[in-house]
Amino acid sequence: MATSISARLIYYAKLSKPRIIWLLDLAALSGAFLSGKLMPLSILAVLVGGTFASAGSMIINEGIEIDKDKVMKRTSKRPTVMGYVSQKEAIYVGIALLTLGTLVGLLDNPLTSFFILLGGLVYVLVYTVWLKPRSPLNIVIGGLAGSAAAWAGYASTTSSFTIPSILLGLLIFMWTPGHFWALALKFKEDYSRAGIPMLPVIMPENFSAKMIALSNALMIPFALALYLYAGVIYGIVAGILSAVQMYFSVRLMRNPTGEEAWRSFKFSSPYLAILLILIILTRLI
């Protein structure tokens, strides 16, 4: 299907899932600032490299999953499904972007490049190809892709992998299951039609709600532990936001419906984003 360059760029922008990429970039930026070393060129390298690699990984994912996306209402209008971008083209372009992002990270240092590549490989090979179609724990292991973004950011200014970086990565790792299981509970029928064994698809709603609450509860210690590096204001806000997150988790356990799951899902992104922004701001003040 012949399309203009501008239209094709728009299609690829949609395939790259910009709402996820900005959160991954925010994770990388908070990791860079968490180190306490402001190195503009290094931060620029990890943001550019990470953006390319993340976009490439998302595009590969949607190239691979075109058949599943066709039967899910939530994904049925994606450019790959509509035929604007072919499966082969999406995969090739995605690989090129992932490779480019890894090379840009290498301009900073090898560890940054390694974590950028690690995030992409975990998302594409471990999550998309291996676990997502086979295991209800797919998103648990897939959460390492988000952790890798934070680790890449920290490595960009330190060339190291130490306790602050590990804590930030574990925060994102533990945040991921509760966030995406809530989404899967809301769109349970969609995932079921596509044959994707998300936890809420194969387990009862009340059990899924308890697992979402457990994931969120296990996330909170890592959020609070970052107070040691981000300061008192961060600690206070993290405590308040964590209490609100658990409020939504309790509501979901009491009433495990798609509507309550959606409320939990909608709060969890701002929860993480605010914490990441606070880490950045506390290092600037």
Swiss-Prot record:
Cite the EC number.
Answer: 2.5.1.141
Which Gene3D superfamilies does the entry link to? Answer: UbiA prenyltransferase
Which GO terms of type biological process are on file? heme O biosynthetic process
At the top of the EC hierarchy, this enzyme's class is: transferase
Transmembrane region(s): 19-39, 40-60, 90-110, 111-131, 135-155, 165-185, 220-240, 265-285
GO-annotated molecular function:
protoheme IX farnesyltransferase activity
Question: According to its record, what are the GO cellular component terms?
Answer: plasma membrane
The UniProt entry lists membrane topology as: Multi-pass membrane protein
Q: From the UniProt record, list the reaction(s) this protein catalyses.
A: heme b + (2E,6E)-farnesyl diphosphate + H2O = Fe(II)-heme o + diphosphate
User: What other remark does the UniProt record contain for this protein?
Assistant: Carbon 2 of the heme B porphyrin ring is defined according to the Fischer nomenclature.
Question: To which protein family does this belong?
Answer: Belongs to the UbiA prenyltransferase family. Protoheme IX farnesyltransferase subfamily.
The protein's name is Protoheme IX farnesyltransferase
Q: Which organism is it from?
A: Metallosphaera sedula (strain ATCC 51363 / DSM 5348 / JCM 9185 / NBRC 15509 / TH2)
